[in-house]
Structure formats: structure tokens, C-alpha cells
Amino acid sequence: MKTFVAKPETVQRDWYVVDATDKTLGRLASEIALRLRGKHKPEYTPHVDTGDYIIVINAEKVAVTGRKAQDKMYYAHSGYPGGLKETNFEKLIAHKPEMVLEKAVKGMLPKGPLGRAMFRKMKVYAGAEHSHAAQQPQVLDI
């Protein structure tokens, strides 16, 4: 018996919508990363993008535990000497709420072209509205 290998043209991708209200950041991100990779499907193949599309709403209401709201730092470098910028969770969630969840999920996906293709299937919105009603997404309770 030969090992099954999924072919990119035969992969069935579904659309799911996830409400991030009061969900813990890391637990939510790990479940989203698992679904973007397709590891929840029996036809999962490591070198083929078998994952689903995920729409995340209410990203501004995601929760962190303990003192992480004040202590968790995010870093960015401009490439110039002395160009390291840092901001904490509270400031980033107030300024760019989508970026918090995007950075968490992106770090859990494979690095390289396949990981970037998986990441493009995630759509994050700060509020409750999204523009993907035509895809008829199913509600995914995490």
C-alpha cells in the first residue's frame, strides 16, 4: 500500500469565521495555525498547502493572561543603526489590533514560501464586520 499524497489541485478548502472575543491569544493562535496548515484533515501532507481559510473577527478583544498586557513586548527594526523600535501589548492592541494576532500565528507557521501561502489564507478584522459574506463561512467555535 502506498502512502497517500495530497495534490494541490484536489484540496478542498473551506471558509471559517472565528470570534476572538475574550479568547486567550496563544491558545487561539495555535488552533488557527493548525487549521491554516490543514493538520486537522486526514489528507494532510507536509509539503502541500491543505489548510482552510480563516476569518478572525473582534481581534481587538483578544485576551492575555497575567501581566502580559503591560510586559509583553513587540520589536521591529528599521535596518539602520539604533533603529530598534519596541512597543508593548497594550499600545499595539490600541494602535493595530490585527497585528497582534497576525504576529502570533505567523510565528507558528512554517518559514518559507509554503508558510507564506498558508498565512495569506488568514484574514483578521478588528471589529465584528468582515467582507467575506460571499464565501459563506461557517462559524468555528474554538
Swiss-Prot record:
Q: From the Swiss-Prot or TrEMBL record, what is one GO molecular function term? A: mRNA binding
InterPro entries the record matches: Ribosomal_uL13, Ribosomal_uL13_bac-type, Ribosomal_uL13_CS, Ribosomal_uL13_sf
One of the Pfam families matching this protein, by short name = Ribosomal_L13
Gene Ontology CC: cytosolic large ribosomal subunit
Q: Which UniProt keywords apply?
A: Ribonucleoprotein, Ribosomal protein
Gene Ontology biological process terms from the UniProt entry: negative regulation of translation; translation
- Gene3D superfamilies, sorted: Ribosomal protein L13 (3.90.1180.10)
What assembly does the database describe for this protein?
A: Part of the 50S ribosomal subunit.
Q: What does this protein do?
A: This protein is one of the early assembly proteins of the 50S ribosomal subunit, although it is not seen to bind rRNA by itself. It is important during the early stages of 50S assembly.
Q: Which PANTHER family match?
A: LARGE RIBOSOMAL SUBUNIT PROTEIN UL13M (PTHR11545:SF2), RIBOSOMAL PROTEIN L13 (PTHR11545)
Family that this chain belongs to: Belongs to the universal ribosomal protein uL13 family.
Spell out the protein name for this chain: Large ribosomal subunit protein uL13
Identify the species of origin: Alteromonas mediterranea (strain DSM 17117 / CIP 110805 / LMG 28347 / Deep ecotype)
